[in-house]
Amino acid sequence: MENFVISNIKARQVLDSRGNPTVEAEVYLENGGFGRAIVPSGASTGSGEALELRDGDKERYGGKGVLKAVWNVNSKIKDVLVNNTSDLHAVDQMMCELDGTENKTNLGANAILAVSLATAKANARAKNLPLYKYIAEIAGTEDEMSIPMPMMNVMNGGEHASWATDFQEYMIIPKGAGNISDAVRMGAEVFHALKEILKERDYPTTVGDEGGYAPRVRDGNNEPLECIKLAVERTGYYFGKDIAIAMDIAASEFFDKDHYVLKTNGDWKSADDMINWYDWIINNYPVVSIEDGLAENDWANWQIMTERLGNKIQLVGDDLFVTNSKLLKKGIKEKVANAILIKPNQIGTLSETIEAILLAKKAGYKTVMSHRSGETEDVSIAHLAVGLGTGQIKTGSLSRSERIAKYNELIRIADTNSNLGLVNPF
């Protein structure tokens, strides 16, 4: 438990990478410790996520302002925390008790998480530790610290790119890399080669929210896999050995009652059709991870998919679990998925984020730290991934500086700590 005392808290409204308002918070300690954090925002969100408090005033930012959340930090949260301990678990507990709701409806998860992350940074600075070491210390994961394998989003679809494809993300995993610098280089080389492939097919090379290319492909949801294959081969890497693929289907976004309705062509597919499709994909392409392959409420079919494909591939629950330990416990009990995506703003405090990661690891589930589509220059998730030893990280493409910032921070961390090796979970 930290013996530091919080002397001041301040929040303000700033912008995320999509030009939408978000919350930035600063925490000051009596001993001079200081932390600043900005929270991100999602596009495709799970229904069980903690509440992101927006103003709803159509006269300002189309109703997306966060002045209410900022006011909550500068008044209610500040009144409770100033002159109190900066111990992270205590701070998070006090904020949750002050909010008084399960999904942080009153104060807003965006207000609470901003203060939670800023407090962690202030404590780390007060102890003269990098954030990742402080996180490992409070979580008891010092022996698990490592550089995560990146999942790099190179083609966007779904909600992130106006339904250019039905599937939301096509990612490359530079699993043949020996260190994070090589991983970033390999990813960048494939990303640039992919641009040339798309140009040759007369596709535009504009990018989506997360920096991946977002062309409206002509030949269906498998065409991006072919384009990536050609890009990998053009760079001289071995498809499958050096570069593998991960996909985020985000199936909840096109689920309708008991069917999956593809928005690009109107086809209706059953859950069994979707599972068969994934089975075909992993037998024809080096796809090693599928996220949200079925809808968040389609639990019975998630069980079937896990039974059929769980020994072949990583099945990641994002909307399914929303970084919530209660939902993860249900998934573990019912043998649903075998990995969890971790997004701190889905649950709203750093303490609860750590709890979900530790629970997943204990159950043998893999963990993937993740950004959001509305990101910021804040690099906290790079430190969380290292300090908590998540083994994998999703932080976007090899373009857009809010994505690159996380890769650069991982390079810095590795450069200053030679004991931290790049993990290859595949």
Language model: regions and residue ranges:
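Metal- or metallocofactor-binding catalytic centers and their adjacent structured scaffolds
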Residues: 40-129, 138, 184
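Mobile "lid/hinge" segments at catalytic clefts and subdomain interfaces of large enzymes
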Residues: 48, 140-141, 145-208
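Buried hydrophobic packing segments
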Residues: 81, 115-123, 127, 170, ...
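Catalytic core of soluble alpha/beta enzymes
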Residues: 222-426
